[in-house]
């Protein structure tokens, strides 16, 4: 799913910023500085070459050959001047995808032209970093979602990236920087997550966070994205969703709880990539994470972005 930390916020710096949060009484100035640093890192990540604003296409593969290029006669058509009319063919055989470029298509792998006489086996993002091909400003690679394989395209000159307006937020408020109780599940639970395309996956939930706000307790299930992660991931919706904030909910990444205590800073709640781009496959909050509470903190709806709801 499209909730990998490395592409949401940008690897080690993002983790460092979360692991030293200003939470629960450390002072307004410290909270302000922590959140502003986090916001800067988020904007830098979004506008980077691998940021969500570069996404320009997503094509699901059928078994066998899938011709790819900029002219209408191809199975996969991307109308872009950086792509040859007939760029090549993606071949799906079982769970393996290969690519055979057309002669003189100018397709590069690791900066070198790909041999048009031999297919190149492509690793998907399911096992980590996918094999990335290039054509001019375009980058394309294989993704796997719920057992389906597709080709994702990035355009380094995508107008969404070049015309990025910046992000807007609720005012920073210490009220939303909280210490929560972490309720561990023994054993960890599998929770069903549906993405924006209707695909289903089972994610691992090691436990829930329970926090107090407005005179009552609230509970959110967390997700462990990969074994050994230093963070937990939360998908949530609230009473601002579809109004001030993105209709399909928001995300929150928190440091791994210690001694049953979780640090939640909703001032660092952020939009899924689907709020910024039509070509992401964002997970939706599970029903138990949709709260009748106005979380007036974190990122607001992106002006000019796609709009989705449950």
Where are these regions (language model features)?
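N-terminal pre-domain segments of enzymes
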Residues: 27-59
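Forkhead-associated
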Residues: 54-55, 60-128
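An exposed acidic His-Trp-rich patch
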Residues: 111-125, 217-268
